[in-house]
């Protein structure tokens, strides 16, 4: 298993940040691996709710079925996924107040399937995943700190 942890300070309240990042329609706006999702609501996913996401990682396209495992607004959200190619992942978002904003942490633990993909992960995919995760949080900060995101991803 591979673990990638990234953190960023965002000048928005924790509830705003969590509401935005847990609404799947927003994922392609800030995460470079996210191509599309199969939902048409901008609402946060709650425990046991599911979404299918099309992703591209290391040049490989996959469809992942995500299931929410934990939802503690505005502090923590955990989602578990399984790709059609056999890979698995758990993503945990941790949020805490930081001044007038939020300390946001994204913790990704994933495993690819098959010996060939495991080798490619060590040689190639892991580096791309690390870079994509850094870029995702930079883009998230930029999107949420822009003036046009008020009201996006509000809880149901």
Per-range role (PLM):
Residues 7-11, 38, 54, 67, ...:
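Generic structural detector for well-ordered beta-strands
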Residues 14-15, 42-45, 69-74, 94-103, ...:
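A short, structured loop/turn motif at beta-sheet edges
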Residues 3-5, 61-65, 87-92:
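Short, surface-exposed coil-to-beta transition loops
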Residues 16-21, 27, 51, 68, ...:
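Hydrophobic pocket/interface hotspot
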Residues 49-56, 77-84:
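Short beta-strand segments that buttress and anchor functional surface loops
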Residues 1-46, 155-156:
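Hydrophobic ligand-binding cavity/cleft-lining segments
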Residues 39-40, 139-156:
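Short, highly charged C-terminal tails/helix-capping segments
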